[in-house]
Regions:
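Juxtamembrane helix-loop-helix connectors linking adjacent transmembrane helices
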Residues: 2-5, 10-12, 34-101, 111-131, ...
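Membrane-water interface of transmembrane alpha-helices
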Residues: 16-33
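Membrane-embedded alpha-helical segments of transport systems
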Residues: 16-17, 58, 197-202
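Hydrophobic membrane-targeting alpha-helices
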Residues: 24, 28, 61, 65-69, ...
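Transmembrane helix-loop-helix hairpins at the membrane interface
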Residues: 88-208
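Perimembrane helix-loop junctions in membrane proteins
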Residues: 30-34, 71-75, 106-107, 158-161
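Alpha-helical transmembrane segments and their lipid-water interface positions
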Residues: 22, 63-64, 107, 202
Length: 208
């Protein structure tokens, strides 16, 4: 079987190519700049990303530490310096790329795409003289749709197989939270920081 670190690297590697693929679709097919699906600001706000990353890391580590103190028997120390170093290098480089990619796809590209779709649906219904769906409903549909898709894409995760499909509620809820943050802040920088931190802490602390 493949080494776990090598397997992690191979699983994350497609994210790099997918990022270029997303750029190609946005730039060449939609004739838009990548920044247009990232933020309403002129450029990516790294301060927001950094703030989100640090805040979520502090919260996650605090909860994880508290969980260990309350249920110490549920955890086992499994530390190998060399393997951890390799894991750290892979994670610190690849996981932020993968997390930002997911935010760009779900909270950027798809959120905007579904907004256009549901807006057109609203206009069609209005023209035909049918019952008009109220605007707030139209606005939240892209949020719920992208969150459900985001949650379902985690259905093959190992923890789902062990704990059960009920855990999908957590992923859908996380998608909703990231989506709300994106809508309120008018950009994916904060949610990308939260997402990268969440995945990085899980990779380094839980699986290490």
């Amino acid at each position: 079987s493949l080494d776990k670190n090598l397997l992690l690297f191979l699983l994350l590697l497609p994210s790099v190519f997918s990022l270029f693929g997303l750029w190609f679709v946005v730039k060449k097919i939609h004739s838009r700049s990548l920044i247009s699906i990232i933020t309403s600001r002129k450029k990516f706000d790294f301060k927001r990303f950094k703030f989100g990353f640090i805040l979520w890391s502090l919260i996650s580590i605090s909860i994880f530490t508290l969980e260990i103190l309350i249920h110490p028997d549920d955890y086992e120390l499994n530390f190998n310096f060399l393997k951890f170093l390799i894991l750290f290098l892979i994670s610190i480089i690849m996981i932020p790329v993968q997390s930002i990619l997911e935010e760009l796809i779900f909270r950027g590209y798809l959120m905007q795409g579904f907004s256009v779709f549901f807006k057109d649906l609203y206009l069609i219904k209005k023209v035909k003289g049918e019952v008009v769906i109220n605007i707030p409903f139209i606005r939240i549909m892209p949020l719920f749709t992208t969150s459900i898709i985001f949650g379902l894409l985690h259905i093959l995760n190992p923890e789902i197989q062990k704990i059960g499909y009920g855990l999908l509620i957590y992923y859908v809820g996380t998608g909703l939270f990231f989506g709300i943050v994106t809508l309120m802040d008018e950009g994916v920088e904060l949610s990308s920081g939260f997402h990268a931190s969440n995945n990085l802490v899980a990779s380094l602390l839980v699986t290490a």
